[in-house]
Amino acid sequence: IAFSRNLPKGVARPVGWEVLKLKAVRDPWPGSHVRQAMVLTGSDVRGTIYAIYEFSRRSLGVDPIYWWTDHPPARRTSVVIPAGFEEQQGSPTFRYRGWFMNDEDLLTVWRPGKADKTGISLAVWDRIFEALLRLKGNMIIPNTFIFPYEPQVRAAGDRGLAITQHHMEPLGLNVYQWPDNVPYSLD
């Protein structure tokens, strides 16, 4: 996995929004013990994430939704990359692509641990985020009635996903939380 500072000679960092590049390189770092390398890089962080997942799909046979379909990838003893292999996928047609986790209560059968403090286990949230990234998504609405301090919001951001909202959280504010120290009445 290469970023600008460690790209092998002859491999240029792609340019654009979320562009990924895969390239087989011989003698990538002259003078080192590495004779061949498969370079996975991107124009930005998500482009690099997509390069990793594209390599795992194409070369390792990992289905983007393997966990959800109960089809784990087959174990491999070796991977053959054709000499001179190179692929670059340009910027996506649509700048933002994502999911709205509507009816997320249907996933609550995967109970969270007490430390999760969320309706769905953080381990399951991680699988949701992984599948979205493997499918080259980049944004998510993680819940209805979500608060910005909830752990799944941070977890999505840590995975490189943009957080967005829908009509229930105008401007990112969940208006259904009333401060504990302010009296209210439904009368």
Write out the residue ranges for each language-model feature.
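Aromatic-lined carbohydrate-binding surfaces of glycoside hydrolases
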Residues: 1-7, 93-187
